[in-house]
């Protein structure tokens, strides 16, 4: 059990490190702070762990899988931000903190979520995701 927990923590750390570097390279915008708030608000990155496990069966490169996992985490964060909106579930708390729309306003939360979804596609076209890996994934 401890070995699995250590692996989950390593994958979460590696995924967050990639995402932090990727976000840092984004064009300056008022949306960066709410995007980071939704993206780095906790969570175990279980989706990335599942992706790494499946990818390892097909002998995919770990770094490529981290890049794919980062895209998945962006999509997940986007879905949580939008799910919490007043027009959806109207949740004011997410992972023990105010929801993105409560902290930054509804319009900003919508745009931050949309930006995370767009960023996921940008990540999928990342230069370090080798063409041969993309073929294996398809």
What are these regions (language model features)?
Residues 1-23:
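N-terminal amphipathic/basic leader segments beginning at the initiator methionine
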């Amino acid at each position: 059990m401890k070995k699995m927990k250590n692996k989950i923590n390593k994958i979460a750390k590696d995924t967050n490190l990639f995402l932090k570097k990727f976000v840092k390279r984004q064009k300056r915008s008022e949306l960066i702070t709410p995007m980071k708030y939704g993206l780095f608000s906790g969570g175990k990155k279980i989706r990335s762990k599942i992706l790494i496990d499946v990818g390892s069966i097909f002998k995919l490169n770990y770094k490529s899988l981290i890049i794919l996992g980062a895209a998945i985490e962006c999509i997940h964060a986007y879905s949580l931000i939008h799910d919490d909106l007043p027009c959806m579930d109207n949740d004011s708390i997410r992972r023990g903190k105010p929801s993105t729309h409560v902290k930054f306003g509804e319009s900003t939360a919508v745009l931050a979520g949309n930006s995370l979804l767009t960023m996921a596609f940008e990540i999928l076209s990342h230069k370090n995701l080798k063409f041969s890996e993309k073929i294996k994934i398809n």
